[in-house]
Amino acid sequence: MEDFRITIASLPDRENLVAEISYKNKQVAEINQETNNLIIQIYSYKDNGYWEFSLEEFQKVIEEAKQKLIAVG
């Protein structure tokens, strides 16, 4: 999971904090709490048309980002 990074951020276009998920310094996804549910937005990869990495690893990163976001409110 060393290629992934999770950043909890306050963005000007969001009321609540978000969890940004990056892979090799490029943003892959964002988890937000703008509604009563957690929502994930997955971004396309401009250079290659798609992202490719281990499903198990990505699931772990998503869960870690979710837990960090919930912990900070």
Question: What residues fall within each predicted segment?
Answer:
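Negatively charged, low-complexity tracts enriched in Asp/Glu with abundant Ser/Thr
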Residues: M1-E20
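Poly-acidic low-complexity segments
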Residues: D3-T7, N37, S54, K66
